[in-house]
Amino acid sequence: LLLYALSEDPFFSKKDILLIEKESKNTNDRTWSFCEKKEGAFEELLEKKWDVATFLSSSVSLDFKLAPYQYKMLRSKGFYKACREKIESQKNIQYLSAEKTALKTEGNASKVITTEGTFSSKNVFNSVFDPTALYNQKKYPVLKQHFIGWFIKTKSEQFDPNKILFMDFNIEQKKETRFLYVLPLDSKNALVEYTLFSANLLEKKEYEEGIISYLKNQRITEYEIEEKEQGNIPMSSFPFDQFNTPSLLNIGTAGGWTKASTGFTFMNTSRNVSKVVSFLKTGKPLNHFNIKNRFWFYDLLFLDVLSKYNSQGSKLFE
């Protein structure tokens, strides 16, 4: 996202930019879903968007309109392709396939040490998440948004393509916060995810049994699994920005840009990228960049309650 934003701004057209990735990405290895007002930068790449959402629990059954927002799905394959085309079209952007082995700040520059050599810059942006510090502390509560999702195709029409099932808590909670999440692409195709906000991961079998059980309860028995995906996203208000330096800025999940109360990352990152682009034009040291606001504190409080009363998650979201 940051590379794309920099490439769109003429201010950076004469700046040398190097993108280092462990391997080139060209598949649907992830799906981003997010709320957004009006048309966004990736509107043409969207898989689908919706205007209505459903929330279900033992005591609540609610359809609600999202206006002035829309809920949008962006799949990674199209996004990666757009980024590759952007890199290839601009001479000031170079791509390197290499594995990062270390990051070091020395003087007024940071060094990226890779399997293909060492690179130094006064502005280094790191999106590789290192969980060590997060899980070695006790001050800030830590949960995970973890899930397995199936893209399925049913034999008959089963889904309302005009609305998403945002959260369905009408499944066995097992003393945790568990729900189903369904994004219908049309009346026969949908992404169905079994999701938890909890401290510990499950065996793969348990997520998939949860999906099978849910579909059976919805009387959906004839379907094909076309794709699978899984994820594990940290949820915490831990201050990752303490690891930034004058020449190094951690971004995305590595920078604490995931919304702590939900595990959503894409729109938070998109907003922060816009702020970074403006910030770079000031010439200030990167560790002066700050994203904290009152919502950071609200998320901290919410997550503290959710971690202590994880079995009551559905009541909190009601």
Q: Could you say what each language-model-derived stretch is?
A:
Residues A5, D9, S89-Y223, P239:
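Predominantly flavin-linked oxidoreductase catalytic cores and closely associated redox partners
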Residues K100, K174, S198-K275:
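FAD/FMN-dependent oxidoreductases across multiple families
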Residues E47-W50, K175-T177, F243-N244:
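Short, flexible loop/turn motifs enriched in small residues
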Residues A5-S59:
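N-terminal FAD cofactor-binding segment of flavoenzymes
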Residues S274-E318:
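C-terminal helical "tail/cap" subdomain of flavin- and related membrane-associated enzymes
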Residues E36-A98, L103-N108:
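A conserved beta-strand/loop capping segment in the N-terminal third of enzymes
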